[in-house]
Design a protein with these regions (language model features):
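Conserved HGGG/HGGXW glycine-rich cap/lid loop of the alpha/beta-hydrolase fold
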Residues: 1-12, 35, 236, 240
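Conserved Rossmann-like nucleotide-binding pocket used by diverse enzymes
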Residues: 2, 46, 209
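Residue in the alpha/beta-hydrolase core beta-strand immediately N-terminal to the catalytic nucleophile
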Residues: 5, 43-44, 48, 67-70
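Glycine-rich "HGGG/HGxG" loop immediately N-terminal to the catalytic nucleophile
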Residues: 6-21, 56, 80
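Conserved acidic catalytic loop of the alpha/beta-hydrolase fold
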Residues: 24-43, 53, 61
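Glycine-rich nucleophile elbow surrounding the catalytic serine of serine-hydrolase chemistry
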Residues: 47-57
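A catalytic-pocket lid/entrance helix-loop region that shapes and gates access to the active site
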Residues: 57-92
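C-terminal subdomain of alpha/beta-hydrolase-fold enzymes, centered on the catalytic histidine
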Residues: 89-253
Length: 253
């Protein structure tokens, strides 16, 4: 298993010669890492949040060299509105403030961990104090909160350019994990898969595995790691399309 660090996020320094770095350019870097540098002829990719965007681009541009991709699909809700607006519209203003105050940066990050995780009102049910301080310290000591924010602005500023016009756009076998805490309003977990299949977004993917879990929030690999790993394995091994909820498997008609 290979876990690359996203440029500008914590462990990975920003690339000074690539100020326009965004998710689809990161996909090119990761594909080069896997094939040219590490020598893999084929590989599989999984990710959440911005990592899910990278996986989607890999499955679009490099489908023939992937066993498949597995990702989280986020329902765009009002709880994410302030976060996205600030990152996209005023990244530098926000970055200066957060880079100047460790307490301010921790408060900004903590608010998202509290509100976006399925914690039942107790954040330490998901993240221990040590986890929280470790995550925040990685951003602080590397001074990378600003460069991480810039990625969101670049995703919007430099729009995605398709590599081909074939259908579906993401041709690699694709699995998706849904979690109850991010169900759209009025949609229960047992209806989540069907709700997605009836949406326009489903047509973007060569779907082979859709799984909905009652529990779990935005930070899926951290919150429900065992289920996430099981979902990945099914996607990369599944011989035929499947859908599952925590009530059990079902088969598309």
């Amino acid at each position: 298993m290979i876990v690359p660090s996203f440029p500008g996020f914590g462990f990975s320094s920003p690339l000074p010669d690539n100020p326009d770095m965004n998710f689809w350019k990161v996909a090119d870097l990761w594909h080069s890492l896997m094939t040219d540098i590490l020598g893999h002829e084929r590989y599989a990719a999984g990710g959440c949040d911005v990592g899910a965007l990278v996986c989607g681009q890999l499955g679009h541009k490099y489908a023939g060299e992937l066993y498949g991709i597995h990702a989280q699909v986020v329902a765009l809700e009002k709880r994410f509105a302030v976060h996205l607006a600030a990152h996209v519209l005023a990244p530098s203003t926000l970055a200066y403030g957060l880079s100047d105050s460790p307490a301010g940066m921790l408060a900004w990050i903590l608010e998202r961990w509290v509100n976006w995780s399925d914690n039942g009102g107790d954040i330490e049910h998901v993240f221990s104090k040590d986890d929280l301080c470790t995550h925040a310290t990685i951003y602080w000591v590397t001074n990378s909160i600003g460069t991480s924010i810039r990625t969101y602005a670049n995703n919007n500023r430099y729009p995605w350019v398709p590599s081909h016009d074939r259908q579906p756009p993401v041709e690699a076998p694709t699995g998706i994990t849904f979690v109850g805490y991010e169900n759209p309003p009025g949609v229960s977990t047992d209806r989540r898969v069907q709700h997605f299949l009836e949406s326009d977004r489903a047509g973007w993917y060569n779907l082979v595995n859709l799984t909905a879990h009652d529990h779990g929030g935005h930070f899926i690999p951290w919150e429900i790691p065992d289920q996430w790993v099981d979902d990945l394995r099914r996607t990369f091994r599944e011989p035929a399309p499947t859908t599952r909820s925590e009530a059990g498997p079902s088969w598309p008609s």
